[in-house]
Amino acid sequence: MESILNNSVITFVAYVGIISIYLFVIPLILFYWMNNRWNVMGKLERLGVYGLVFLFFPGLILFSPFLNLRLRGNNEG
């Protein structure tokens, strides 16, 4: 019985780890990368980013209110 409980806990921890990486870690890294490189990306890099956005969309939608990809002004006026 203890072996089954131990396996269940290990499985649960593994699922939580994978889900947290999928929903939190990789989307935050992708947001940081997009925010820094958005206006200077090449064609292939942009295509790769679009593919990653499609792949990690559920995690990205959690953080979408915090992303601003608009052009930065030159602080005049």
From Swiss-Prot:
UniProt feature coiled coil, ranges: none
Membrane-crossing segments per the record: 12-32, 47-67
Primary location: membrane
Catalysis: reaction(s): a plastoquinone + NADH + (n+1) H(+)(in) = a plastoquinol + NAD(+) + n H(+)(out); a plastoquinone + NADPH + (n+1) H(+)(in) = a plastoquinol + NADP(+) + n H(+)(out)
Keyword DNA-binding: no
Function: NDH-1 shuttles electrons from an unknown electron donor, via FMN and iron-sulfur (Fe-S) centers, to quinones in the respiratory and/or the photosynthetic chain. The immediate electron acceptor for the enzyme in this species is believed to be plastoquinone. Couples the redox reaction to proton translocation, and thus conserves the redox energy in a proton gradient. Cyanobacterial NDH-1 also plays a role in inorganic carbon-concentration.
Name of the protein in question: NAD(P)H-quinone oxidoreductase subunit L
Species in which this protein is naturally found: Prochlorococcus marinus (strain MIT 9515)
Lineage of producing organism: Bacteria, Bacillati, Cyanobacteriota, Cyanophyceae, Synechococcales
Gene name tied to this protein: ndhL
